[in-house]
């Protein structure tokens, strides 16, 4: 017979579980949007987790896979697609909500990242100014990534993502080397596994 002298209860705070974290896609990720992606968590509620992919220029994403909002005119959509194809400052933030973009001034992000959301149709002139202005530290992230809390937890548990403390200086890396650098820093190789995940 076992006599219990003291019972210790451990309470896990599930809120803020992803605060100041970054998701690094495992090499087995085959989802076309999230393969080799680095996602910084920007918002967390009791039901959902939101983030922005940091390392995918929109030029790498097939424009045919992007659906624009109905409130954008055909002319705006045509101009928008032209801007996307020409600018190196527009990044693909995720496959949700293409009516908005998240603005980031890299030069002011020394200790943390601070994103400002803009509505493209309403702030179209600002949108163009950022993409073609003189300040090369300014970036726009088109769309965002959204998961249900349970969905993201399951994807991490199944090995689709690695959860890592986020260093804001990561944003200064070239997009094409960011993912490989973080994977290597975690002691993993970039060979391919079999698997899938990351559906937002």
PLM ranges: what are they?
Residues 14-141, 145-200:
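A short aromatic-anchored loop/beta-hairpin motif
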Residues 1-14:
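N-terminal amphipathic/basic-hydrophobic helices that include classical n-h-c signal peptides
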